[in-house]
């Protein structure tokens, strides 16, 4: 067995098998394995289509009904049952749908990516048409369109690109009570509202005069007694239900003679002012608003919330309002207004506690995962289709009707296409690295349809709530306008069938911690006292201390006796997200820097050579495997044939399975996703064993950067303000080099003048330009290309005048095409270069490829470019410590240690204290210790909690978040590090070493902190940002150059820059900048001409912006004239001047976008 095989078997835990044996320096042993990090996406979509994961969960719930109930129907079954039956207006016909089935997909995920198609399966439904007059039933299996499928990585492939549907965080349906202080007095006003998943709101409120009112569908307020009468309550029923509440009794006595019909008319008048009010219209209005399932839907979660809050015992499957719901809501609000602590439930011997609701509490916010979002879109499509079906029922001959003739699937297909293609929640997948993709799938967004908007969202909804603990990460969120609106699911959390986030806890019985795990929602958790994971335990799992620190409702902390503790956290990393849990010594960092560290790990570029971190947190293997970018054995067996592209495994059941290895695939962000085989022929593999590493993985562990020898010291001012100095060795050895792949595409279409053509025969192009094109006119694989080089030769017909007979004869003799076609070849854009690594040709005429309307052929060319690290590139650590490379020093000039080892990177020590991210210093120290290896002699006090007594040089260690190694233990380990060959230790117990100046050989005056830090190269590369322009496009409106690299624009010389030149008196430079380099239209053409012909630069003219200010002043009735000492009319517009000068500006000045950047 090979070395790799031995390594894989050496470190296996659960379903994830890792080749790197990482020694944990944590004190807590986690009783619960980290769950599959993609469960949120996979489980939800599986419920939608009724897949095996949902069926297994349903079977398990039926055997042991605990926690939130699992939905009895799949999402597709639910939505087709809702729409059935569709009846015509007379009730003579009806159409029913049942048994939705997804057939096998047409193309594999890989083929869809290559061909630019959508990964989907045809959806069929059994449709049954019934004619009530004759009793005839016609049944057909009907095609309902192609239904996009989720890949096993939790993504969708739409038109060849990978997309992710982000889960939405919305307010849960239910009943809510809130207190708002009145503006002009110290009195508090109370209100209660019933919010459905779909339909009209019902709101009750107490005004400043202590009168209870109601708002129907958010319209005008009216006395609550009108509403009670309208729903059919008698005087006696009102007295029985509300006799104890004076505010309602007084209203009742005033309106004692009010009939139900009068109340209905009054309600209709207030909801529909201006229309003829009648009792029947009022009855229909209320029926449609609150008591009809087609118009009002509480949803399962809304019914659960209403029953739980009000204590009513309504059937959980009843999704409309009941009279008992309304009575209980009014009683609750009246009791809240009077300051009661609890209210009795009518017709029951129980009572419910009274409190107002915190709308930002996660017990009142729920997740709409991908399955529910797609189901809602399907529901909208079916509603549009329903209208078409009803219309066709009335227009078609009843005898000839079959289900197929009634159904038009276009509204359904359009609804799904619109959702996946344009919805705010269907996003282009972040494939910068595996962590970025995984985090994207676990993202929670409060934005989107039915959610908040970033302009209206206040501080409260963005802020961290105590209920976020263990459910939503308090650290990982964007820094810009979306801060707090977009979050990330915590490591151990899961979403229950109601959409509430649950987190696991260990049950504590009589002061003893058990291994029983219980998942709780934020509402359930509020009722218990919960200890933290780091609470010290004895070997028998009882608490060491008699009094234990616990967390209670609202995040309040108190110390209670051990026997009063109900639960305990399962892990120190329970409260944070996946990205944040990858930061070692997180507990020593300021939260702002931890946020930056979490976000910047997602920007790390996959490097040419991967290397796992010396100091990790233990989460690296979970992320690498669950992200889906490593190749994993699905069944145990023996590795057979191994090549760069395919690994064959002979499984224990006798079957041979081929695993295809991805080679140099372009990710959505233009990075190189490449897999490398890590097993050899003859190796034994188990289920879950890593067969091939993906991008940013090293032997099955996430590896985003490189371990570099770092020194914290200033060096000649080059690392001022976060700038970074690196060694030439990092460039020479490709330590931080990365490969980037660009995709270039061209299509041929049918035009009015004829078809475009891909060809090598291009007009007016020399052989030098087409030497690398093949006979088809497409670049050969392996060609080195630069800016302006032709990738695909293409000609387009152009219109021309009628030719004379002589011209036609000459053209026939010399076969000259240049006059009838123009060159529209695909060329390498400005600023790009590299090697052609792949070419794909899709043909709509000969092949089976489905291209767009009017497109005959499509060619895609992939160009790879290796980018070495260079000045201007951005580097970062995992602690929010980021900087730009300012200087690459020759290795001989770098500071070196006593044994001659030069450091790789020099950081400014002043970057640490102000940022308060001290974790980077501890990582540097522990990195040095693990690189050197250690052996603890004897039994010193500082080592009593360290389980790893000895580690070999270059060992990998983990310091879990909130459970890391202490500073005292690090200090002790420095004295246990293996010495060098001369018996000396290069770094002292304070983590510092004497460094020598590479230029002089003299030692620096003070010892310097030296160690190994994990450094990431971020996707902010200087090659993508550097830009220069000589001539280019101008804005049509201002006649000034466009802005930005994308528009090939100029560099803005703004107001303050002008002041600077004025201060220096640089009049000629300033005049040049404000005229011929900007918006002096005639002058810049003259200057271009003069430069080309070698003449002196002419005098600048008048810029367009000056003419604008003159016109503006004239428009303000200020008579301003420009007087010239010559004969020129200075105020004439540019076009007039061009005509007078006889200038043609078209070749030099392109009319660009109207947008100014």
UniProtKB/Swiss-Prot annotation:
Gene3D superfamilies: 2.40.50.100, 2.40.50.150, 3.90.1100.10, DNA-directed RNA polymerase, beta subunit, external 1 domain, DNA-directed RNA polymerase, subunit 2, domain 6, RNA polymerase alpha subunit dimerisation domain, RNA polymerase Rpb2, domain 2. It catalyses: RNA(n) + a ribonucleoside 5'-triphosphate = RNA(n+1) + diphosphate. GO terms for biological process: DNA-templated transcription. GO terms for molecular function: DNA binding; DNA-directed RNA polymerase activity; ribonucleoside binding. Its EC number is 2.7.7.6. One of its GO terms (cellular component) is DNA-directed RNA polymerase complex. Belongs to the RNA polymerase beta chain family. DNA-dependent RNA polymerase catalyzes the transcription of DNA into RNA using the four ribonucleoside triphosphates as substrates. The RNAP catalytic core consists of 2 alpha, 1 beta, 1 beta' and 1 omega subunit. When a sigma factor is associated with the core the holoenzyme is formed, which can initiate transcription. This is DNA-directed RNA polymerase subunit beta. It comes from Tropheryma whipplei (strain TW08/27) (Whipple's bacillus). The lineage of its organism: Bacteria, Bacillati, Actinomycetota, Actinomycetes, Micrococcales.
